[in-house]
Amino acid sequence: MKDRFKQKYTAGAAVAYMSRKQALKKLQLTLKDFRRLCIIKGIYPHEPAHKKQANKGSTANKVFYYRKDINFLAHEPIINKFRDYKVFLRKLNHLKAKKEDEKIKKLYDNKPVYNLDTIVKERFPTFGSALRDMDDALSLCFTFAMLPHTRVLKEGMIDSCRKLTAEFMHYVIESQSLRNTFISIKGIYYQAEVHGEKITWVVPHERGLPHVTDVDFTVLVTFVEFYIAMLGFVNFKLYQDIGLFYPPQIGQVVEGDEMESEEYKEKVYSLAKPLAKRKDVEQTEDDEPLDLLGEDSDALAQKVKEAKNIKTLFKGCVFYLNRECPKEALTFIIRNGGGVVGWEGAPNDLKADSKNITHHIVDRPMDKLEVNRLYVQPQWVFDCLNARRKLPTERYMPGVALPPHFSPFTSEKAGDYIPFERLEELRSMGKDVSELEAAIPKTMDELPMRRKEVKPEKPKGIHIAVGQMHKKSKEKFHETVEKGQELKMRELMISKKHQRVYHSMKTTFKRNRNDALKLKKKAKLVKATAEA
Amino acid sequence: MAPGKRTGAAKGSRHNKKYWRKGTDITDIEDAIHDRSHQAATGGIVEDMKDEEIFVVDRLPTSKKTEEPQRTRKQQAALEKITRNITQEQVSLPKPTGKVLKKPAKLPRGNAILKLKAGVKKVAKRQEKEPKFDVWNTDLTPRIPKEKLDNPEAVEHFLKVVKKKQPKTPGKSITTLLPAVEVAQGGASYNPESSEYQEYVTRIAGEEQRLIDSEEKTKRGIEPQWEKVTTEHERFLEMAEGLRIHPNFNKNDEETTTTVTQEGTEETVKNGPVTCERMTKEQKKKKAKAAGLEKDEKKRLEEKAREQDSHNVYRTKQLHKELDEEEKQRHVESEARKKKKLLNKLTKRQKLGRGAFVEAEDPFLLKEELTGNLRQIKPQGHVLDDRMKSLQRRNMLPIGGTKAKKLKTSLKSKVVEKRSVKEVVKGSRVI
């Protein structure tokens, strides 16, 4: 009987994957539309394990997608909207050439739009999954909110980015969930804990953003388009959870038209005023768990304690921001800590000479100081949040060289050089630093001095002395020698393969130790010269 | 005065003054003055009058009305239908005389203007922003009311066909384990601690140095190290060799010739004599003996192995144990390999598209640029750049690259008729 051979490329990787070109052909879409669709639906390319198989024998570097993903995309109703849009553009072109303004207006009124509600739910079946994807969304939206509008970046998109980010910041303030901040030269990093999820995002500095050339804006715009839809829902849910009105309301309840006014928007965006809460929702104060847990060194208890510290960080303080300070960042942090913020022209219009100001934030040399308030530089606010307590203000006075600003996101390893200030900060945060401290190598003067034993002078001539016991220290010496020998023997026993790794590890330990020692010595020297 | 008919002084030469006074024809001017005075006396000077005072716009048709084309009754009816005044209030049709069988017809429904009068304004569809709702607590699955279609399977099918309902989402695998936002290192702080800053900057400097080195290396590879370029002067000297213009012509003729001959003798290469040495009898014997010994040894080893194999029957238990162990080991290794593969997939960059991933350069400030306060900070790097790189690193975006141009491997043939061939026509003589 004749054998029936299986045809090549009818199973396995050849069928499981689909190249982008094939996908375009299947979906009848242009590359631009396909890219948009993939981003909106959250479908990403994959590198096949057997590239040659998937590529039907060729080794060219192509973009591959899972076939099942593409099949799934084919059912998407948005594809029809894309096609409608294509028709819309064609009609628009036609009418514009004919200069039929009436019809153009009518056409614009009936512009095809698509709705991303179902897609948001499909991609994030639970609220938690949406929260886990907030990092990207927030970072992009915060940046887009600062960009000028162009042909690709529509004004409406930038406005909604601004709106949604302000809303989110309001939520963080109201729920007092900001945990860490870090000012880097790239921008300011924030970390908040929302529903137990750590959300980290970056906000560029409040300067004109430089022009970027090698960024494909059309791609990012599509991402932002989806994130705007998602953030809207997330914000709504977050607001619902803590009993706030959505869209946010300040003071009295206002209606639709008034909310759209520029003045009202500015008020909301300034973050300076607290939001109105719904009457029908009971406000819960959860102080109980802390009492239940007690003063354990348990990690959870520690966390709860930290959260409570942050909530009452700036309670009862009134801050006045000088006009050169970054208002958004400072307002965000201070209000998160329960403080009150104001500046000239703010919604609450705090005057510089107001009597109830406790802290005045200044970022330039001052010559006229008032007596009954503390003057600090902006870094103090950031460092206070990271340290979870109000730091002494002496080192942050205007005109004083500031202490270094540490990143709260780095975790210290035992054996590294940790500056004295950082150790202090860690200790103040209630962390156990004994291990870190112990691992710091000691300088010569720190080591316990070996006391020279004063030998009793031997009497000259023949004499009789009491017999001496065998020296214990010598025994110890022998022991250490033996230990060393044993170690050496064990080192010899290591297989050749692992020997190299072992030695390289040893040298790095040694190097790190030396580095740390050197740095410590330097710091000591600097301190000594400063004191002298 | 008629032309050609001259009288009196006019008969004389036209060059003289006399002619100017007497012979000039002034009738035109006199006529014009007369006209003007007459106009002034009768109504007014026409030249000074405005258009409206003189002319009247003629509003009456001058030509006879064109006759209407003859129309059939049908055409006339159609014309009336399209030209009738639709703003006119329409009343119900006249009541039929005689027996009434049906109800009177209603007003035609499509009278838009009447509706407009009545106050029903049609507003163009505006894309209003819908208020947000709780997506996670609302059911978004499309439905069809039961009275329209009560067969659930049919409903399902219908919704799928009209793309209202989506098929099940394919299982989403986690694309990456990398964090979405990587926080900048401590050294990138706007007011960094000196040791952290040092560490951060030395790392960047090291990377930069490596880049410079690699660039230099490629440069070295591309450029020939000891390339000799013939200059124009050298070329000239070579061409002028032996000519009168050569600076060294006839200078030391003899010396050069001698040196040339000497060099010539040195350059000839001599091959060594080819020898063919044969092995002596002794050597042959030795070699044969060694070969024999080797063969014996091989045989002995084979024998030994066979014997050992035969003994293996008694240690099957041991062998089973060994095999089991080997299998177990292999399984452990394969598991580890799988784990590593997965980890690589989730943490490393995949090759997606033609382009190569370029790691973003970490921004840094020089020591003198670190102002130490927030007001004078000099922001570095761009967040969007970072975002883009992060998306690429997490395998969420393909990286495009230019397609390599293919060089033509075969050239096209072109048919050309040479002139000499073209010249040959019918009847031309072959020489």
Curated annotation (Swiss-Prot), chain A:
**Where's it found, cell-wise?**
Nucleus, Nucleolus; Nucleus, Nucleoplasm
One GO biological-process annotation of the entry reads:
lipid storage
**Could you tell me which InterPro entries the record lists for this protein?**
BRCT_dom, BRCT_dom_sf, PES
SMART domains, alphabetically? Answer: BRCT (SM00292)
Q: Which pairs of Cys residues are joined through disulfide bonds in the record?
A: none
Is Lipid metabolism among the key words of this record? no
Q: Which GO terms describe its molecular function?
A: ribonucleoprotein complex binding; RNA binding
Main localization of the protein described in the UniProt heading: nucleus
Which controlled-vocabulary keywords does the entry list? Nucleus, Ribosome biogenesis, rRNA processing
Pfam families reported for this sequence: BRCT_2, Pescadillo_N
> Which terms in the GO cellular component ontology are assigned?
nucleoplasm; PeBoW complex; preribosome, large subunit precursor
BRCT domain location: 309-398
Query: Where exactly are the transmembrane stretches of this chain?
Result: none
Q: What does this protein do, in the record's words? A: Required for maturation of ribosomal RNAs and formation of the large ribosomal subunit.
**HAMAP family registered for this protein in UniProt:** Pescadillo (MF_03028)
Q: Which family does it belong to?
A: Belongs to the pescadillo family.
Record's protein name: Pescadillo homolog
Recorded name of the encoding gene: lpd-7
